[in-house]
Amino acid sequence: MLKWVQSGLSAVAGTAEPEYGREAIHPITDTITDKSKCYRETTIEDFGWKQPTSTNVETQTFYFTCLKTGYLGFAQVIHSNVMGVHTTAQFTFRFFNFKGKQEDNLWTSTKLEDFRCEGSNFYANGLSIELDKDNKSYTVKSSVNKDSVVDLTMVKLVPGVIFGDNGTTYYGDDLENPWGSMRHLFWPRCSVSGTVKSGDKVFEIEGYTMFVMALQGMKPHHAAKAWNFLNFQSESHSAVQMEFTTPMSYANTKVNIAILTSNDKILSCSINNEVVHENPEVDETGWPVPKAITFNFDGLSDDNKKVVGKVHGDLITLVERVDVMAEIPQFIKNIATGVSGTKPYIYQFCNDMEIEIDDGVKESGMGFNEATFISE
């Protein structure tokens, strides 16, 4: 999330939008009238890179969790186009040990050269991300940074998920000609195997992965003022939830999508769930940071049975508080903060969490969640 927020803010110097109202946003959740059929299974074509010509950021992110060894992280490629004139690509990698081996924690962000999108695949010098022809596995290989040499294979364990018809929320007063968009699609539970090399260290990775592809077709601080995100993995279940809240320009509209799975099937896909920030405390940035969090899930199964669940945990371990504007020139930062009230921070947490589902499931696992604050 860091790079696309940075690029958007830098390009527009923080200008604020007028108040268009609720009628100028068209959430994908508004199109879903039958909650037992709120998603469809993804196809190879769904994962094709869109590459719009206007301002946008497209990402593919693979969140991996190795429950036995304690290693967790993500590999991400970011393809961005600023105002239709400047296209860049970046490979970011986060590696973290939630069992306390702080010396193994690392973060790399590397600019890509000679990059190209080919259907659902992505290539650059020293990097390949490929979806197999059977739509069952992704392979990520990267040697673009010696501190994070990655060779991972993800195999789908449950069907891929896209909400509604195309997973896209549109912005604009004319739905046929929107001026912005937000799109997400998922592989909520996959196996992962491979290695991560950092210097002379080699880490064997074997566990579970959640894969998400996203497209944000507008300036980031115009699209959302806050985000909540969860990737929870246990030995038998996965839980994924993505929520964003628009600025006042789009009536503080909240869009929430969520997925619960067992090890081999989708239990429920749901919309309009509630994320509860518990015991928030205002830190030195001025944002109310939660000390615990609950992600609620309230939906229907494919056979129309009610499925209610939650993932809860204390937010003891903060992996990083990311100051999105840290690398932006001070004069742009001053304008952005003063004009639009933008002061974006991403709080990345990794903690033991517990999943409960109303059929009697109660299981501990590992949760990686983000709480992002962009503007008031």
UniProtKB/Swiss-Prot annotation:
Compartments annotated for it: namely: Golgi apparatus, cis-Golgi network membrane; Endoplasmic reticulum membrane; Cytoplasm; Nucleus
Q: Name one GO molecular function term.
A: ceramide binding
Keyword tags: Cytoplasm, Endoplasmic reticulum, Golgi apparatus, Lipid transport, Membrane, Nucleus, Transport
A Gene Ontology cellular component where this protein is annotated is: endoplasmic reticulum membrane
According to its UniProt record, where is this protein mainly located? Answer: Golgi
Keyword Secreted present in the record's keywords: the answer is no
Membrane topology, record value = Peripheral membrane protein
Cysteine disulfide links: none
Q: Does this entry carry the keyword Endoplasmic reticulum?
A: yes
Pfam families recorded: Svf1, Svf1_C
Query: Which stretches does the entry tag as region Peripherally associates with membranes?
Result: 1-18
Q: Which processes are annotated in GO (biological process)? A: ER to Golgi ceramide transport; response to oxidative stress
Family the entry assigns = Belongs to the SVF1 family.
Q: What protein name does the entry list?
A: Ceramide-binding protein SVF1
The species this protein belongs to is: Debaryomyces hansenii (strain ATCC 36239 / CBS 767 / BCRC 21394 / JCM 1990 / NBRC 0083 / IGC 2968) (Yeast)
